A protein has these predicted regions:
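N-terminal small-residue-enriched
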Residues: 1-165
Length: 165
């Protein structure tokens, strides 16, 4: 099955789910080639491929200028999401306080804990520049780890609470 570009969320609404031949037939939708395996002798599993947030129209500086009081997560030391893909947690590695549109002092290990609907519902703007990093999509028993790319632009979230470790 030929892989195709998938737009899972558009304007905050889920528009598509990952499918293989079996699930697509069962649900009466088109197969979008989302099953892969680590080797010929393993069952193909529905899994993410290269996944990213599409760019927007803003520079990083423009995004920061929009913030009255907040935190800029420049990089992350950890992130995780539960098996239901509902609750997620992000811990900043390099992060800065933002006051009145200006970057300030470093912040030690800020934490964003949020649900998936709240995360996507809080997006206010996206940056122009997209950065990617390598990752692994791990699934199955026995475990199958497949290389993928993740990433996206700097993204402005509004109305979220940031804690600390």
């Amino acid at each position: 099955v030929r892989a195709v570009k998938r737009r899972l969320i558009v304007d905050g609404e889920i528009t598509e789910f990952l499918q293989n031949r079996s699930t697509a037939a069962e649900l009466g939708v088109k197969n979008n080639g989302s099953a892969r395996s680590v080797d010929f002798n393993r069952e193909p599993i529905i899994r993410m491929s290269n996944t990213f947030v599409e760019p927007g129209d803003h520079t990083v500086e423009e995004l920061i200028k929009e913030v009255r009081h907040g935190i800029y997560f420049k990089s992350f030391t950890e992130w995780n999401i539960d098996d239901k893909r509902l609750n997620q947690r992000y811990v900043g590695l390099e992060a800065y306080r933002i006051e009145n549109g200006q970057l300030g002092t470093l912040v030690k290990a800020p934490v964003l804990e949020i649900t998936t609907p709240a995360l996507w519902g809080s997006v206010r703007a996206r940056g122009k520049t997209v950065a990617f990093e390598s990752a692994t999509c791990g699934k199955g028993d026995p475990m199958q780890g497949i290389p993928v790319w993740t990433g996206g632009p700097d993204t402005l979230l509004g109305g979220v609470r940031i804690g600390s470790r």
